[in-house]
Design a protein with these regions (language model features):
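Acidic glycine-/aspartate-rich tracts in secreted/extracellular proteins
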Residues: 88-91, 156-158
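Polar, enzyme-active/binding microenvironments
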Residues: 19-21, 31, 120-123, 166
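Short beta-strand and beta-hairpin "edge-sheet" elements
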Residues: 115-162
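Short, charged, solvent-exposed linker or helix-capping segments at domain edges/interfaces
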Residues: 95-98, 160-168
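Broad gene-expression machinery/nucleic-acid interaction feature
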Residues: 81-83, 111-113, 146-148
Length: 168
């Protein structure tokens, strides 16, 4: 093994911009000021981080039939939608809605920067995004009520030196 890590203990933090479009280097927190739960206390998984890479074929017509096709990378990035799967209950709903309200109170084109920290890592994964309200999830009898909350990504700094908080 090469030092694999588990997902238990992941921290999900956010911080508002002081200057629109500039990633904060301090002030990251795990829950809204009026929230009860840290985000990681109700999130059970995350998706949407994997990059989709568009490519263009540049194989010349002189290539033999069984020759190797050639490609160049074009645009890359994810689909802009980060989904956090979560257990839904009144406390998690209210905690998420408090985060959404904090974002809606920002002015001047400011947004949140989010940071994902894996246990034992010296770097965090940073992206800028707007949290969307929590909607009523699909549900079935005999199952825990779970659903997704979504963050619409608008920028990404990728892996950078982590900005941790003691209480996160």
């Amino acid at each position: 093994m090469a030092g694999e890590i588990g997902a238990l203990g992941v921290k999900i933090l956010y911080a508002p911009e002081s200057t629109a479009g500039t990633r904060p280097t301090t002030g990251y927190k795990a829950k809204a000021t009026s929230g009860t739960l840290n985000i990681a206390d109700f999130v059970t998984g995350a998706s949407g981080f994997s990059a989709d890479i568009d490519k263009g074929e540049v194989t010349p017509v002189s290539t033999p039939q069984y020759g190797r096709r050639q490609f160049i990378p074009l645009l890359y990035g994810n689909d802009g939608s980060i989904k956090l799967s979560c257990n839904i209950n009144p406390t998690s709903r209210d905690s998420w809605e408090a985060i959404v309200a904090e974002h809606q109170a920002l002015t001047g084109g400011k947004s949140f920067w989010w940071e994902i920290i894996f246990p034992g890592d010296t770097k965090g994964y940073f992206f800028r995004g707007e949290p969307c309200p929590m909607f009523c999830p699909d549900f079935n009898a005999g199952e825990v009520v779970q659903g997704d909350v979504e963050i619409i990504e608008s920028d990404n700094d990728g892996w950078q030196t982590k900005v941790d908080v003691a209480s996160a």
